[in-house]
């Protein structure tokens, strides 16, 4: 395959059909609620309108689940705040070096708590995993109560960290369709997955499961450089 690769360069004069310009400083952390990646709100909007938005999600879920199981999210509200049961950063979508380093910076010095909330991180590759060990990110995550697992995309398709029945999981992964996380509707099971960015998931973990946008925490990101070690694959 390496012999089949070649460099791609633009010509001296290049024409484009158009350009999409995005001012990233104006983008707020988002959450895609169950049960579709397009069911999107800003985290601030959700936290400000919890009862109304969760009720709307529940009504849509009745259609998605075809009434096969009972479904509720409003029971996740405690003292006016939304508490989730699980946080996961995983695989090709979330498990990149920069994401996990930023998550480690956010959660460093905090503790995820000893209640129901759990936090798992799956690096996208073994070389990434090794570099995270070398630079101390894994130690910072583990000290806070994070479970750092092998390079595996399992949570994305229900092969790892399947939530408990009626649990609510926030994930930096790719999809949140009904039962994709591993629950079996034919056995009366249902769980909810909402898609978020890794930094906001880490901020939520630092707050022991209270849904938190990364913009609501004050942190200095270390931004370490990634060094690829090919020996893992060469050996």
For every predicted segment, state its role.
Residues 1-9:
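Single conserved hydrophobic/aromatic residue that forms the stacking wall/gate
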Residues 3, 13-14, 21-27, 122-125, ...:
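A glycine-rich phosphate-binding loop feature that marks nucleotide/adenosyl-phosphate handling sites
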Residues 12-16, 79-82, 111-114, 140, ...:
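Solvent-exposed alpha-helices and their adjacent loops that cap or buttress functional pockets
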Residues 20-119, 123-126, 235:
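Non-catalytic terminal/interface segments that mediate subunit docking, oligomerization
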Residues 32-36, 98-102, 130-135, 159-163, ...:
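Short acidic, glycine/serine/threonine-rich loops at helix termini
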Residues 87-99, 154-163, 174-178, 189-206:
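Conserved phosphate/anionic-ligand binding catalytic regions in large, soluble enzymes, centered on
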Residues 94-95, 112-163, 168:
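Extended C-terminal subregions enriched in glycine
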Residues 181-235:
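Extended hydrophobic packing segments that form well-structured cores
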């Amino acid at each position: 395959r390496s012999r089949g690769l070649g460099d791609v360069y633009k010509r001296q004069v290049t024409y484009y059909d158009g350009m999409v310009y995005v001012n990233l400083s104006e983008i707020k952390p988002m959450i895609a609620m169950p049960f579709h990646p397009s069911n999107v709100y800003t985290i601030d909007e959700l936290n400000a309108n919890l009862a109304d938005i969760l009720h709307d999600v529940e009504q849509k879920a009745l259609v998605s689940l075809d009434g096969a199981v009972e479904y509720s999210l409003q029971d996740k509200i405690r003292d006016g705040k939304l508490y989730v049961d699980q946080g996961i950063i995983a695989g090709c979508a979330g498990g990149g070096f920069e994401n996990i380093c930023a998550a480690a910076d956010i959660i460093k010095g905090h503790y995820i708590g000893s209640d129901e909330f759990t936090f798992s991180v799956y690096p996208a590759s073994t070389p990434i995993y090794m570099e995270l060990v070398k630079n101390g990110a894994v130690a910072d995550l583990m000290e806070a109560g994070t479970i750092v697992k092998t390079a595996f995309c399992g949570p994305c398709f229900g092969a790892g960290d399947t939530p408990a029945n009626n649990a609510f999981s926030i994930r930096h992964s790719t999809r949140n369709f009904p039962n994709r996380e591993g629950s079996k509707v034919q056995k009366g099971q249902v769980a909810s997955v909402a898609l978020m960015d890794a930094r906001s998931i880490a901020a939520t973990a630092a707050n022991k499961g209270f849904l938190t946008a990364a913009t609501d925490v004050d942190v200095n990101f270390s931004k370490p450089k990634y060094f690829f070690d090919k020996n893992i694959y060469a050996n």
